[in-house]
Amino acid sequence: MRRQLGSDAGLTARMFLTMFLLAALYLFFLAVLWQAGVSYTGIIVFVAIMLGVQYYFSDRMVLWSMGAKEVSPREAPELHALVERLAALADLPKPRVAIVPTPMPNAFATGRNPANAVVAVTTGLMERLTPSELEAVLGHELTHVKNRDMTVLTLASFFATVASFIVQNFFYWGGAFGGGRDRDERNNIMLVYLASLVVWLVSYFLIRALSRYREFAADRGSAILTGSPGQLASALVKISGSMARIPTRDLRQAEAFNAFFIIPALNGNSIMELFSTHPSLERRLAYLRRLEQEMEERR
């Protein structure tokens, strides 16, 4: 039984909390820069410009990086029909549709808001899934669009990337141990480095935690839209099994986009789930089984 897809209160609360904590973290970093005597006006202007570019052009950047091609209803009528029907059920404007020519079975959604969203699937995904399974995967991606979690994740990840860049290039820029610097200057440089490290680490784990929860929320949304959690579970098993047979070299080329995929290109064991953008397959299947039982009880 299909039901109306509403907002996910749990995800909304977590997104607000994550953004609040990250904002506090970045204000702390600016305070450290001020304490160290660093003129951060230019840094703020540069970051603001890059953030604007990331916000407005993220969809084009992701599609270009993945080699995705937007397709018309004439080129992919069945795919467009599925997307259009699910978008109507989710009370969303129909997103643009793209296909990625790769044997790796996966799907993702991108775009700064529902009016500018793109849903993309790979040729490998369309070849492996039944129409019902494909519908369930598309329902998952459209739930991301509905929840607007793509935008929050993109903005949050941008600042974490800036902090990571500072940490990784610190010693290249001269480090705290270069010659010709007095003791206070070396201490200030080390202070900025340590603050960048803290910002990066805390941001990393906050974003990963939000990313894992949003996958559960999207799985739930797919179950509501299609009325069939079992079809999504079947699709996840097929995708995960197919990914295991793809050469690691090919998977690593797509690893940077793990947060956008329905299944990460590379996944670790359960011990490493804390570092993952997605919950483990086992946890997602167990969650979908619970949803199916709940839906059966309501029928």
Curated annotation (Swiss-Prot):
The active site is at E141. Keywords: Cell membrane, Hydrolase, Membrane, Metal-binding, Metalloprotease, Protease, Transmembrane, Transmembrane helix, Zinc. It comes from the Bacteria. The keyword Signal does not apply. This is Protease HtpX homolog. Its main location: membrane. CDD domains: M48B_HtpX_like (cd07327). Belongs to the peptidase M48B family. Pfam families: Peptidase_M48. Binds 1 zinc ion per subunit. Its EC number is 3.4.24.-. It comes from Moorella thermoacetica (strain ATCC 39073 / JCM 9320). Zn(2+) binds at H140, H144, E215.
